Curated annotation (Swiss-Prot):
Assigned keywords, A-Z: Methylation, Ribonucleoprotein, Ribosomal protein, RNA-binding, rRNA-binding, tRNA-binding
Organism this protein belongs to: Nocardioides sp. (strain ATCC BAA-499 / JS614)
Protein name: Small ribosomal subunit protein uS12
GO biological process, alphabetically ordered: translation
Function, in words: With S4 and S5 plays an important role in translational accuracy. Interacts with and stabilizes bases of the 16S rRNA that are involved in tRNA selection in the A site and with the mRNA backbone. Located at the interface of the 30S and 50S subunits, it traverses the body of the 30S subunit contacting proteins on the other side and probably holding the rRNA structure together. The combined cluster of proteins S8, S12 and S17 appears to hold together the shoulder and platform of the 30S subunit.
GO CC annotation terms, alphabetical: small ribosomal subunit
GO molecular function: rRNA binding; structural constituent of ribosome; tRNA binding
Gene this protein is translated from: rpsL
Subunit composition and interactions: Part of the 30S ribosomal subunit. Contacts proteins S8 and S17. May interact with IF1 in the 30S initiation complex.
Location of region: Disordered: 1-32
Stated family: Belongs to the universal ribosomal protein uS12 family.
Residues where 3-methylthioaspartic acid is found: D89
Amino acid sequence: MPTIQQLVRKGRQDKVSKNKTPALKGSPQRRGVCTRVYTTTPKKPNSALRKVARVRLSSGVEVTAYIPGVGHNLQEHSIVLVRGGRVKDLPGVRYKIIRGTLDTQGVKNRKQARSRYGAKKEKS
């Protein structure tokens, strides 16, 4: 516990919070070009083939981004919009691709949580 005199001399030091999405450079989203689209396996105890893409962002940084939803139309040179948000069972994946914008199509036949997957309302 510091004395008042020590606080007068030095003061309290601010806690430095770590940026979780440094490649976005403070923006909510960034546009990028897919350099590689592939699948990876998650950490234990999960088992799957998770769809991910290597994306070169407009900020010049290359990141690994997760492609959410069932099925996708992405390939090399596709232009995508990337947001922050990690995938817990994929180490090093700290970004997600936004569905339904630019070259990324929305998820087909999606009934619930449509806005997250860029799916339009079905005409009934």
